[in-house]
A protein has these predicted regions:
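N-terminal subdomain of nucleotide-sugar transferases
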Residues: 1-42
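Conserved donor-binding/catalytic core segment of Leloir-type glycosyltransferases
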Residues: 4, 181-207, 222
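Short alpha-helical donor nucleotide-sugar binding micro-motif in glycosyltransferases
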Residues: 73, 128, 251-252, 259-264
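Nucleotide-activated donor-binding/catalytic signature segment of Leloir-type glycosyltransferases, i.e.
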Residues: 234-252
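Aromatic "clamp/platform" in nucleotide-sugar-dependent glycosyltransferases that forms part
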Residues: 272
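Short hydrophobic beta-strand element within catalytic cores of glycosyltransferases
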Residues: 289-292
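Conserved acidic donor-binding segment of nucleotide-sugar-dependent glycosyltransferases
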Residues: 304-305, 309-316, 325-330
């Protein structure tokens, strides 16, 4: 099939989609407002004059490119068109007079954008209702999005490469009893963007409480990621007196993220908002037990009580207690970790998830008309 993605070419998730479908023998074109190269795929870059991190007002410049998008699609004549992110690329697709196309919602386009104003809400409704087929990475996000459209969603989770994300990255470690008697650190952490919605401040405060209430615990905190609150969080760690046990790893690529998760005794994802818990899925694939906050997108990505421990969001004390209990119980860490990998490999393995999307494409490709 000829598949055309209308999505940011420099985004990791876009690239993952392109690589998988290219490797299946499909011809891939990407229409993007950001520059980027994707091996084996054709990227049609449109300079909209708005940066990827520009304001909503700046990104209105995307919309005047609808005619250009139409022209490119008309030239490609794809069998499948899939726009990604409802309130930028999805809106352009809605204005471009395209054949029936798919729209994949991502997260902030559903959870944050429509709450800014009535105009933002109407823009999202317009985008959702113009698409022929709607895709969501989670049931939780589909439920949230259903406030803005009566159209049904097909659930297409973000898949994880279970060969890359694997306990084999650090064979033989982690399942001994972690305490000061054997001199090994208790390594906890997360791999997330450093912004308020992901609960990084809660994680820092919980770590400080754990250290204060149980000074015998040899805890080491690892945080991988970049983001707008980075300086604020580093200052908070210093204020809390945990800067000497906190390792700020910065942005790391997927290969290093797999190693980071596999090397942890416990993964922490205390998000306050999450469309789908990709980080929790990656951690579980590495046999790393996880503690998550009680938000639907994270709970859907785990099996609470079987592969994860759930604590209330924004509650550092409850998180600190869960971290301590996980430290004390090596058997529980082992059982959660083993169950987590089994769950992910059976439910969210990369090929399983993309094969489902491919089958959806095949089923509807015959309905896609030429421009």
């Amino acid at each position: 099939m000829k598949i055309c993605f209308i999505a940011p070419a420099n985004n990791y998730h876009t690239q993952k989609w392109c690589h998988w479908f290219r490797n299946r023998g499909h011809q891939i074109d990407v229409i993007s407002f950001t520059e980027g190269e994707i091996e084996g795929c054709t990227v049609h870059y449109i300079n909209s004059g708005a940066g990827v991190r520009g304001s909503d007002a700046q990104k209105l410049k995307y919309l005047v490119q609808a005619r250009k998008v139409h022209e490119i699609v008309n030239e490609i004549k794809p069998d499948v068109i899939n726009a990604h992110y409802a309130t930028s690329y999805g809106t352009v697709a809605a204005l471009a007079n395209l054949p029936p196309y798919y729209l994949s919602v991502w997260g902030s386009d559903i959870y944050d954008f429509p709450k800014k104003s009535i105009l933002h809400r109407m823009m999202l409704q317009f985008s959702l209702n113009r698409a022929a087929y709607l895709l969501s990475t989670s049931k939780a996000m589909a439920k949230e999005a259903s406030q803005y459209t009566q159209k049904p969603f097909t659930i297409t989770p973000f898949g994880v490469d279970c060969e890359l994300f694997s306990p084999d990255k650090t064979p033989g470690k982690r399942y001994d009893v972690v305490n000061t008697r054997n001199g090994r650190d208790y390594v906890i952490g997360t791999v997330k963007s450093l912004s308020d919605k992901y609960g990084i401040a809660t994680l820092l405060r919980a770590t400080a409480l754990l250290k204060k209430q149980h000074p015998e615990v040899p805890v080491q905190l690892r945080i991988a990621g970049k983001g707008p609150q980075e300086d604020e969080y580093k200052a908070l760690a210093k204020e809390l007196g945990i800067e000497n046990i906190t390792n700020w790893m910065g942005f790391i690529p997927q290969e290093q993220a797999a190693l980071a998760w596999a090397s942890m005794d416990c993964g922490i994802t205390p998000s306050e908002s999450e469309s789908f818990g990709v980080s929790a899925v990656e951690a579980q694939a590495c046999c790393t037990p996880v503690i998550i906050s009680d938000i639907p997108g994270l709970m859907e990505a785990t099996m609470p009580g079987k592969t994860s421990v759930v604590v209330p969001r924004k509650h550092p004390q409850e998180l600190a207690q869960a971290m301590f209990e996980m430290y004390m119980d090596a058997d529980k860490r082992y059982e959660l970790g083993q169950a987590g990998r089994k769950f992910v490999c059976e439910t969210y393995e990369l090929n399983l998830c993309f094969e489902k999307i491919e089958e959806i494409y095949f089923q509807n490709a015959k309905k896609t008309e030429r421009c």
